[in-house]
Amino acid sequence: MRILLSNDDGYLAPGLAALSDALQPLADVTVIAPEQNCSGASNSLTLSRPLSVQRAANTGFFYVNGTPTDSVHVALTGMADARPDLVVSGINNGQNMGEDTLYSGTVAAATEGIMFGVPAIAFSLADKGWAHLADAARVAAEIVAHYLAHPLPGQPLLNVNIPNLPYDALKGWQVTRLGKRHPSQPVIRQTDPRGEPVYWIGAAGAALDASEGTDFHAIANGFVSITPLQLDLTHTQMLPATRDWARAAGRAS
């Protein structure tokens, strides 16, 4: 078995090293990740300049002067000697739940695998800090091992959030849907040394829909959250109303 491992926190991130170590007994693991922290990079590709790939002498990890999506894209289309059986991303320093998934470089790295027909799993530690990173890596390895032994049909994309708790305090796995957040906090306006205004993006909004069955609810109650995602963003329930709206303008059949 072959696993391609990436992340969005960068190739020096503790979460990447811990997950790499945890996956080594399961498969042949190739690690390629961004050179710098790319949190919030989403599915961005670098098209305005060439990319370079270097290899860290101490870990053997490859790193790219680009985004998480760049990293997986380069690996799958320009470097891989053989097609991986699974793309894995993480472990992210912080949760990726609800609308986070649209911004997340961690989820994006996994999504790029799906774009090329490779099943993928993204892992995030639900609270920032590495207090229980070893426990999270153990959980991630268990999920990957179960997937490799019992693959899901098709080309699944799983978004996994793990509570930042000791292993024995975890209550198990729950398959969830995405919850929903309140809008993000306003930007933080400051002034630079030259007197010019600068802006920091504000914090993510608090949970709006954290009802039973959501990723937010699972994490709050000590469960590992596993959410199946898809690439198709079509709002199928809106198709009839949108067709009627277009026909009313006399511009649609």
Swiss-Prot record:
One of its GO terms (molecular function) is nucleotide binding. It is an enzyme of class 3 (hydrolase). It catalyses: a ribonucleoside 5'-phosphate + H2O = a ribonucleoside + phosphate. It is found in: Cytoplasm. GO terms for cellular component: cytoplasm. Keywords: Cytoplasm, Hydrolase, Metal-binding, Nucleotide-binding. It comes from the Bacteria. The keyword Isomerase does not apply. Binds 1 divalent metal cation per subunit. A divalent metal cation binds at residues 8-9, 39, 92. The keyword Manganese does not apply. Its EC number is 3.1.3.5. Its main location: cytoplasm. Its cofactor is a divalent metal cation. Belongs to the SurE nucleotidase family. NCBIfam families: PRK00346.1-3, PRK00346.1-4, surE. Nucleotidase that shows phosphatase activity on nucleoside 5'-monophosphates. This is 5'-nucleotidase SurE. It comes from Burkholderia vietnamiensis (strain G4 / LMG 22486).
